[in-house]
Amino acid sequence: MFHHISVMLNETIDYLNVKENGVYIDCTLGGAGHALYLLNQLNDDGRLIAIDQDQTAIDNAKEVLKDHLHKVTFVHSNFRELTQILKDLNIEKVDGIYYDLGVSSPQLDIPERGFSYHHDATLDMRMDQTQELTAYEIVNNWSYEALVKIFYRYGEEKFSKQIARRIEAHREQQPITTTLELVDIIKEGIPAKARRKGGHPAKRVFQALRIAVNDELSAFEDSIEQAIELVKVDGRISVITFHSLEDRLCKQVFQEYEKGPEVPRGLPVIPEAYTPKLKRVNRKPITATEEDLDDNNRARSAKLRVAEILK
């Protein structure tokens, strides 16, 4: 059974200004904590579309949400398919959309999934167990240059080249098959002094591999741009991010749509086409409370950004 503590649960949903008969999308169902909190505020005319690319999460969520199943439509898909999902459901616009971009605790804690650098498992890291690309494929078959690129770009790992060289040397002897085997190789590529600070030495490379396997940043960028077009006027979008790459991307997209296109000089009245599409509800991201941190240490890096649609 999934046991997952949702980060900033109240804030994420409360900032949506939930209407009891509204239609909402949970883009990252996970352990269904946010979904349950939202569903408790909807009447029987309200509806939640719950998306997850992990079928196991959906199966478990059905148990968590068993008292509200008549109000939920479950969709096994990637949230980058948002427009198509709504089209298939004959829904044009919704009242609010929210994202929790953290890996759910069960995915981290079930060793077989291969997300954790604390447990030994095969190198997998797929959110969607039906897709082909795995961490094993990347680690053993991608070029040295490609490894350096993803470790640096997605993990912000300053020892990317050294780690990629060690991986290259090891896989020439035999395939690298398990998470703890990879952890030992990563440690070889990081100077002893640097290993003693900044958290677990494998943290950044594992993050980079997870993002690459699941194409996370590209999928989120595709999805959030669709979300902005799919939410009704006065509706809101809430996004919880867990690392600087996601947060920066979310901030940039919201800023871009808040600014709107550049207005030609000399116009007596600004046409609607040049007015902002949205406004940021909070200029600075909301961070986890002490209470959140007591419940869930993973909340330490969480940031919540909210936007309201204007047209």
UniProtKB/Swiss-Prot annotation:
GO terms for cellular component: cytoplasm. GO terms for biological process: rRNA base methylation. Its main location: cytoplasm. Keywords: Cytoplasm, Methyltransferase, rRNA processing, S-adenosyl-L-methionine, Transferase. It catalyses: cytidine(1402) in 16S rRNA + S-adenosyl-L-methionine = N(4)-methylcytidine(1402) in 16S rRNA + S-adenosyl-L-homocysteine + H(+). S-adenosyl-L-methionine binds at A32, G33, H34, D52, F79, D100, Q107. Its EC number is 2.1.1.199. It is an enzyme of class 2 (transferase). It comes from the Bacteria. SUPFAM superfamilies: Putative methyltransferase TM0872, insert domain, S-adenosyl-L-methionine-dependent methyltransferases. It is found in: Cytoplasm. Specifically methylates the N4 position of cytidine in position 1402 (C1402) of 16S rRNA. Belongs to the methyltransferase superfamily. RsmH family. This is Ribosomal RNA small subunit methyltransferase H. The gene is rsmH.
